């Protein structure tokens, strides 16, 4: 995080602190109006998700990469490489310091159970969200996969169209994508 925060055009934002007192880190870059959020390791045992995030950060901060330059010009990108530093440090597989599965807290996060999600949601409320990717991993699946938003009451047809479009693009662009 410190190395990336020192890159030109990257801002470090401390979103808050965890129950163990660790920083909830966010890296922000880009100058566009489209608000893009990438976040990983709500489940700390999914270390591959952070590896993916490291690759995404490396790509997005590469001044020689024309796609990254275009994205930074069109978007404001917010990256939380590790949503659950307490769980990561403690060696937990799915929970934070008090045993909360952060992935289940988004509807009603609290400072006592899920300050990590609360801090991220507060920042999302400030910036807005046009695209969000919650990066997970499964050591038993040797491919990239995405899961949709089935069952979310506020889901719109426009969001569904965007999701389907993204899935088609991902399928065309990477042989590692599992459909």
In which residue ranges do the predicted regions lie?
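Non-catalytic propeptide/linker segments at domain boundaries
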Residues: 1-11
């Amino acid at each position: 995080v410190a190395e990336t925060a020192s890159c030109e055009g990257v801002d470090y934002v401390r979103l808050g602190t965890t129950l163990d007192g660790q920083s909830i880190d966010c890296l922000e870059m880009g100058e566009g109006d489209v608000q893009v959020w990438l976040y990983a390791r709500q489940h700390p045992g999914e270390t591959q998700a952070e590896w993916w995030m490291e690759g995404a950060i490396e790509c997005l901060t590469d001044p020689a990469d024309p796609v990254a330059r275009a994205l930074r010009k069109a978007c404001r990108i917010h990256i939380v490489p590790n949503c659950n530093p307490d769980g990561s440090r403690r060696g937990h597989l799915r929970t934070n310091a008090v045993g909360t599965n952060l992935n289940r807290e988004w509807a009603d996060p609290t400072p006592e159970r899920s300050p990590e999600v609360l801090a991220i949601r507060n920042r999302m409320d400030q910036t807005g969200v046009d695209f969000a990717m919650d990066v997970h991993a499964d050591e038993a699946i040797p491919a990239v996969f995405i899961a949709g938003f089935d069952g979310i009451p506020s889901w719109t047809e426009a969001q569904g169209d965007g999701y389907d479009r993204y899935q088609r693009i991902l399928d065309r662009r990477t042989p590692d994508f599992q459909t």
